[in-house]
Each structure stands twice: as structure tokens, then as C-alpha cells.
Amino acid sequence: MRNLLKMQAITPEAPLPSLKARQPTVKQESENIALCDGQSLFQELFFFCTVKNVGDVPGTGCIYVETVVDRDSGIAFAKVYSARNAMNAVDILASRVMPFFERQGATIKEIHTRRTSEYCGLPPAHPFETFLATSHIQHLPMERPGQPYNYLCEQFYRFLQKEFFPLALRKHFQLSLVEMQKDLDVFVEAYNAMQMKR
């Protein structure tokens, strides 16, 4: 993915199909709503690509995608960032994940993560650990490197790589992460509507 921008030969003049054409189709018929109680969530950070002096990413920087997936329902969340740190790991929970489950009347019980510096440390110094502790959420970090616990986040990220980001990069050639996030929110909302109708 490091050479994604070069490999795709993205040009601002290239015709851009509507993002709506790539959004998951939401079935209209009555179906059973998937269990969506936030009992067990999985969170993972992915490196997306490296950019240089583009848009609102100054200098030579990286783009990361923070993802969270509900184990039982498949409901997912994603945000793009220009850095990897504990504050961004907290931000996606505070701005996307917790408000969603609060609207559902659900309480998050536990979150599984890798045992990396973004997620693990000693409270009160570590923002992510402190946030989970004050929110009464149990943190379950991976016990050993390479443990394949995060397949849910991996599958969701691969779906974004295939269905969202190629189109989004063409649309946001100057790489405004703010504008890209707006489109990502719309895409993820449609994705979640499909998950809840399964």
C-alpha cells in the first residue's frame, strides 16, 4: 500500500463515478435485526499509505485508518488520521463508537486490541487505558504477537481498500482528510445499515 498513489496513476482530470455507486446495497425487505449490543468490540490501526506535501498532510507523512468492529453484529467504524497515537485511538471511540451504542441503548463491555503503544500503557498517563477505565470498559489486549484475533477488523479494512479508498483517493486528489472522512462516514453508515439487516 505504500505505493498506492503512484500505482493507481490518479489524476485530477480522470472522470469520477459517484461514491454512491460503490456503497453497499441496503435491502429494503423486513429482516431480522442483528444483535448489536456492544458486548465485545475489536479495535485495530492500519497503515494505509505515505504521501508527500499533499493536502492537509504536511511534509512526508502517513495516512492511517483506525477501525472498530462489533463482534456479534459486524457493525463497524473507521476514521482516517495522519498519525498513529493513543489520542486517535480514543478519538474514534469518543466520536463514533460510543455515541452509536448509546443511541442503541447498549453498553460497551470489552475492547480487544493489539499490545502496542497506541493501546497499552499505565493509567493515568496513558490516554487510551485511562479512557477505557473511566468508561468502565474492560481492555483485553492480545496476549502474544501474531495471534489472529483481529480478523474482523482485517476483513473490514480490506473491504474499505477495495470498495472505498480507490474512489475516494481520486475524488480527494489534493487529499483533504476532513473531506475524505465525510465520505467515509456516509459509506460506513450504508455498510452498517446492511449489517443490521442481515
Region spans (language model):
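Basic, flexible linker segments flanking DNA-binding modules
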Residues: M1-Q39, L45-C49, A125-E129, Q147
